[in-house]
Curated annotation (Swiss-Prot):
The modification N-acetylalanine is found at A2. Keywords: Acetylation, Protease inhibitor, Serine protease inhibitor. Inhibits chymotrypsin in vitro. The keyword Acetylation applies. This is Serpin-Z7. The record marks R358, S359 as: Reactive bond. Residues 344-368 are annotated as: RCL. InterPro entries: Serpin_CS (IPR023795), Serpin_dom (IPR023796), Serpin_fam (IPR000215), Serpin_sf (IPR036186), Serpin_sf_1 (IPR042178), Serpin_sf_2 (IPR042185). The keyword Cytoplasm does not apply. GO terms for cellular component: extracellular space. The lineage of its organism: Eukaryota, Viridiplantae, Streptophyta, Embryophyta, Tracheophyta.
Amino acid sequence: MATTLTTDLRLSIAHQTRFGLRLASAISSDPESAATNVAFSPVSLHVALSLVAAGARGATRDQLVAVLGGGGAGEAEALQSLAEQVVQFVLADASINSGPRIAFANGVFVDASLSLKPSFQELAVCNYKSEVQSVDFKTKAPEAASQVNSWVKNVTAGLIEEILPAGSIDNTTRLVLGNALYFKGLWTKKFDESKTKYDDFHLLNGSTVQTPFMSSTNKQYLSSSDGLKVLKLPYQHGGDNRQFSMYILLPEAHDGLSRLAQKLSTEPDFLENRIPTEEVEVGQFMLPKFKISFGFEANKLLKTLGLQLPFSLEANLSEMVNSPMGLYISSVFHKTFVEVDEEGTKAGAATGDVIVDRSLPIRMDFVANHPFLFLIREDIAGVVLFIGHVANPAVSS
């Protein structure tokens, strides 16, 4: 993906980000989900559904385009172009060059009774780096599930062992999307493990739990406005133009998570206008360690965003298979893994330039001791890899 982005590509990325933020808002507004730790990858879901759009026609394709890309002439082609560039550049593993470890798995699994179109299979494999497999859902559903799970375990080198939970498919299943993304990066500034101490984290129900908090006296990228503090934690990058960062969005109100997610989804520039660009001196600084492994069936949430036809008998997936009568997406299964701890760069990698701050020193506290939202973004392109929230860091969900 070029460092200088075209206007059309920036617009496509903005649509992709808005899709993810709308999903995050839907998750946060659900009482059950709001009380648990959540993580999902809007970019990998977007890529998977863009592939479905390439195999769809008529009103089904129009609906996919409207939800994923905002509609308009040529938008279906823009979806495909964006997906290809994201898969090739943003989601490529960078660990060989000391960048983040990224493992992306995207699969389309169709019952063996259906004949896949060669053109769709070629598009999926070559342009989307996706797996397209014919499996026997009709007579061997458990074996088919095992086949899908083995695939995701293999693609993610064992980081994600299972994407289809037990009983999630049966002999009526015809088409399943499997989607997983793993990310593990090293901070450019390491947290000193000896400074990690247990303290109280305040839950949404008013109770507290003891959990380990990382702390630091280093300058941090911080911004504060309108009852929201935003922390930017850059990851060590490899030998390419990508720069990944984690953002912690901490509402001042202990119960402000749902309202924050709603603002992010309804105000297009809310996030961009609050991304910190300068390092500041910190006063009290506390960030909990957390580990989230989160899987869910995305159908219900996608329907709330207006994506109905691909999951119904009215679906038109005629560019995907021959004789597609009655074929629709049975399920979209999505799983992610996110881990935040003290790990930083290897010795000496972060030393070098000295930044001189000519303004008056301002110390800003950042104490993430209540529920907060986070995201991981590739900053050059603005592509959001993960969105999630931490409701209880003491639980490895």
